[in-house]
C-alpha cells in the first residue's frame, strides 16, 4: 500500500527485532529506502506501488469513496501481479518460522504460510474480526443485530474480489490447492494464532465477544530521531500566533465530507 499502510509494520518489525527476532519486511520496491533506514531487512515484490496508486482511475475512485469500484480495480491489479507477489513472498519467507500479515497481504500470506507449513499472525490497523458491538469500517452505523453480518459481508467482498488472483498464485507458483469458496479464513495456518490490532483501546475499545487470542496493542509508531530540527519557516509560523490544530487523514477520502468537517469543528 501507501506509506501509511507500511510504516506501522516498520514499527512492529522494529519492536520484534528489539525482542530478538529476525525480521524480513516484504513490500513494494519504492519502500526499500524507508524500510532500510530503520535497520530492517527488506525484500521486494519487484514493482512500484506508485504505478497503481497514482493511476488517474484509481485516484478518482478513491476521491469518490466508492469502495466496490475501488475493490474491483484493486482486484484486477492483484490478478495481474499475482505471480510476482507469490514468487516474491515465497522467496522472502524461506527459512522464516512465522508469517505476519496485514490486511492487504492477508490472502497471499495465508497461501505462503500453507505452502511452507508455518503459522501466520494477523496484524491489522483497522477492526476486521466480526463482532456484534460495532459495524464494519466499510458500512455506516447499523443496529447491533446487523453488526456481525456487516463484518462477514466485508470479509466476503474482499475475498471474492481477490479469489481469482489467489487461485492463480496457488496453482502456478505455490502448487497448493485452491482456497475454499468462502475464503481461507479457517486455514490451519491461522488456527489458534494471535490477532494483533495496532490502535489504542481508548480509541476503539475491545469488543467483549472477541476471543482471548485477539489483542489491541496500542498504536505502532516508529521512534523518530530526536535531533530533528523544524525548518525556520515552520518555526516562524508556529510562533506567530496561537498554537494551531492540525487534523489530517492522509490519502483517505470521506463519504460524508461535510459531516466529517462538522465533527472536527465540534
Feature names for model-found ranges:
Residues 1, 248-251:
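Short glycine-centered, acidic/aromatic-flanked micro-motifs in structured strand/loop junctions
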Residues 1-43, 94:
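N-terminal subdomain of nucleotide-sugar transferases
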Residues 28-244, 251, 256-262:
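Nucleotide-sugar-dependent glycosyltransferase catalytic domains
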